[in-house]
């Protein structure tokens, strides 16, 4: 007897943003390239920046976007809690505004969560950061089976019955949300989840992570091509390798001067 087709869940993608205009078009491309059915996705973007991206959202033509503009900046913990209150999906997937997400970001996370009924949250404790100025890739982790950073999170909405972020959290908000890393968890394949780029607009200078020896940090033989593999992502790759945002940074600096 043939198996019944699996009914895919409706997914809420959540993106907090603050003054990251130069990354937004590339963020849109990462979303457009997702291979999960678009009619089963809503994309919640919460913008508390002073340089609102409403105009870019309008030009994008991405009908899945639900854009919310806040009058003042709030801590990342409160912002993530607010996004959760808006989510309609049974699964919530994070996509931050300045990282690269592969086309299978959503589909891979959904598959892992659905195939592991006991797990409430998914993420990747092993993560890679590419340092443009050094031309080097670094591997971070894995740190533990129930550990991941927020940019890799995907979770069942029922998790929100048991936990929430500290509203006052400004960074490293994951520990409290994962209840000291005790939430039932399933690990994701880092190559199908995220590639972080160290750039001048990072909230925290990521060079501090590699300045001192650390058992959980090592230079990797992986390359950007290990992550950005599709022939349709040439423009995205060029942007992240510096051809996109470095000229824009210079333009911003010249405007200020």
Language-model region placement:
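Conserved nucleotide-sugar donor-binding catalytic segment
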Residues: 143-231, 239
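Cell-envelope/extracellular polymer assembly enzymes that use nucleotide-activated donors
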Residues: 9-12, 42, 176
């Amino acid at each position: 007897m043939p198996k019944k087709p699996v009914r895919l869940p409706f997914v809420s993608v959540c993106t907090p943003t603050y003054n990251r205009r130069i990354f937004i078009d590339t963020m849109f491309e990462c979303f457009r390239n997702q291979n999960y059915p678009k009619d089963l996705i809503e994309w919640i973007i919460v913008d508390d920046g002073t340089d609102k991206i409403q105009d870019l959202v309008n030009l994008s033509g991405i009908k899945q976007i639900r854009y919310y503009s806040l009058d003042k900046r709030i801590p990342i913990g409160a912002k993530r809690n607010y996004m959760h209150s808006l989510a309609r999906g049974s699964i919530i997937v994070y996509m931050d505004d300045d990282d690269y997400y592969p086309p299978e970001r959503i589909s891979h996370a959904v598959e892992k969560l659905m195939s592991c009924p006991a797990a409430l949250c998914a993420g990747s404790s092993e993560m890679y950061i590419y340092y443009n100025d050094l031309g080097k890739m670094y591997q971070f982790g894995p740190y533990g089976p129930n550990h991941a950073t927020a940019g890799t999170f995907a979770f069942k909405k029922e998790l929100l019955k048991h936990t929430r972020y500290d509203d006052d959290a400004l960074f490293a908000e994951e520990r409290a949300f994962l209840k000291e890393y005790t939430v039932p968890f399933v690990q994701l394949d880092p190559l199908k989840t995220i590639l972080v780029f160290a750039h001048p607009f990072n909230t925290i200078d990521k060079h501090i992570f590699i300045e001192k020896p650390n058992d959980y940090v090592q230079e990797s033989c992986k390359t950007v091509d290990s992550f950005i593999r599709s022939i349709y992502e040439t423009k995205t790759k060029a942007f992240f390798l510096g051809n996109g945002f470095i000229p824009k940074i210079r333009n911003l600096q010249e405007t200020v001067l």
